[in-house]
Amino acid sequence: MFLRIALTAAMAATLATVSPAQAAFSRLEAERAAVADALALQVLSQEAEAQRAQARATRALPNPQLRLGLTNLPADTFAWDQEPMTQLQVSLRQALPNGRARAARFTAALEGARQTSEQRDLAALELRAALRERLIELAWRQEQGHLLGRQEAVLAQLESQALSAFKAGRGGESDVLEVRLARQARVQAQLQNDTAVASAEASLQRWLPEALLVQGAPASLTELFPTFTSWPTSAAVEDRLAAHPAARRLEAGWKMAGAQRDAAKADFGPDYAVDFAYGARDDLSPLGRRPDLLSAGITISLPLFGREKQAQGLAAAELREEGQRAALRDALRALKADYDSRRSAAKQQSDALTHYETTLFPLAERHWERSLARFAEGTLPFDRALAAALALLSTQSAALDLKRQRAQSESALLFLIGQELDHE
């Protein structure tokens, strides 16, 4: 007796220690692991950093130009100590491009880098949505397998009663055959479903690390989405919709176009250059000692003959800016409309699922139990009993499909909101 108690306690302690480690991973854990492990997202992040570095480089001034040479050299003798204006000259030229245009192009380059960064965030959302679809498919298939097993058990009960009725002379052999065919259809569907489950589990290797795959995926849609709570209106989440990476990417494109327009407008201004020159003359010249010469000046590049080209560039930049602004407004309207549509569908699916669970399920189960009992008593024909069984099975299948649709709506809303729900 003492040994049995000790073994029982040891087994309980072992199960208590092992079960948490074998618990299925949560949806959020899987999504975060997939995002952290995605090489494509790392490529986009590195590209955004590279573009920021290039943007910072646009602010740098061009390199100065150093010139060494002889000036005013006599062409007949090529002697630099005979003419008083001959000099060994060192000159330095520093170009100073249009500052406003340079600052605008720097801003445009930064917005281009932000576009790439937002593209990375959008790709992360799309990756999470694709992973959720796989997890929903897997959880639905697993629940479908359990449901097919329960449905086969229901048909097995009816088959047993039909066989008893046939042996008692109260039914035909066709009744037994019909229910066996229906039962075999469930068995065949179970085999196909098992194959689909294995395929769905294998597809997770594309996204998830081995540590999570060992734990196993959530076994049901309820585990995948613990709460199907109501979603707020689009007006309440307007800021979140506006912060969606798809909208922010278009916003960055709009601001980049605006900066390019500012650069095109600033190009009407002049460019500058500063020149310094020092000319050394020969102290040993027969003409006597001569002082060295120093020169300084400013060069202004006037955009006179390229104004038509610059005007066309400015007009094109303004059109691009207006187009990007229109694309942003359209994207925000589309996000709001899609959110309202998905939210309405999710509410309808939740209401329908509640109706199934509170009304249709109990009704179909009671009808089936009573029909089976009356068929066993011989007071109900076989076709009516089979109809009751099939009604129960179709109710169960319809409810499971509805749960799948509700999970898909939840996933779509998560994608649109761009972040996790407060209740999660």
PLM region spans:
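Amphipathic alpha-helical coiled-coil segments
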Residues: 41-55, 123, 127-148, 157, ...
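Short, charged, amphipathic alpha-helical segments
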Residues: 106-110, 173-182, 315, 382-390
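Bacterial N-terminal signal peptides
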Residues: 6-17
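Positively charged n-region of N-terminal signal peptides that target proteins for export
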Residues: 1-5
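Bacterial Sec-pathway N-terminal export signals of envelope proteins
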Residues: 21-70, 77, 94-97, 104, ...
